[in-house]
Design a protein with these regions (language model features):
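Plant P/S/T-rich low-complexity glycomodules
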Residues: 1-58, 123, 129-135
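Acidic-enriched, low-complexity/disordered segments with a strong bias for Aspartate over Glutamate
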Residues: 13-15, 58, 71, 102, ...
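Mature extracytoplasmic domains of secretory-pathway proteins
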Residues: 64-77, 87
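Sec/Tat-exported extracytoplasmic proteins
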Residues: 85-89, 108
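Alpha-helical bundle/repeat cores within regulatory domains of eukaryotic proteins
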Residues: 93-135
Length: 135
């Protein structure tokens, strides 16, 4: 019988041609996430301690992308996480990694589900390639 040879994920070079992906891309390509961090990184290590409020300290990047909450906070976690990943692998993504972190934190700390939903919609548009970076 043939034994499959495991492959090692390779990190993406942000200077390669433009790359963005919606939540579904990242959920279907966990090896790329693993290649970025080398482990299933908890969201609190990326977004800071306030990211633990709705989901707890142990929520990982893949879990944030796959969360099924239908409110603004659930959408913020899905789309914000995808935006963070996109900003890390594509230097042409409309937001820098710091801008994603700041906007995510502001929406989360507002305590307003409507603000979280509005920010999630903007992240979703960016993830789908419908937002152009303003220089």
């Amino acid at each position: 019988p043939l034994t499959p040879t495991p492959t090692t994920p390779t990190p993406y070079d942000p200077n390669t041609p433009p790359f963005t992906g919606p939540c579904t891309y990242w959920m279907m390509h966990p090896g790329v996430i693993w290649g970025l961090f080398g482990f299933w990184c908890p969201l609190v290590r990326l977004f800071g301690p306030s990211a633990a409020v709705p989901f707890g300290h142990d929520l990982t990047v893949p879990e944030a992308l796959a969360n099924t909450r239908e409110d603004g906070m659930g959408a913020l976690y899905r789309e914000g996480t995808a935006s963070l990943l996109n900003s890390m692998v594509n230097n042409r993504f409309p937001f820098t990694t710091q801008e994603v972190k700041d906007a995510f934190g502001a929406a989360l700390n507002s305590g307003d589900d409507g603000a979280a939903a509005a920010q999630a919609r903007l992240f979703k548009k960016a993830n789908e390639g419908h937002v152009i970076r303003q220089n």
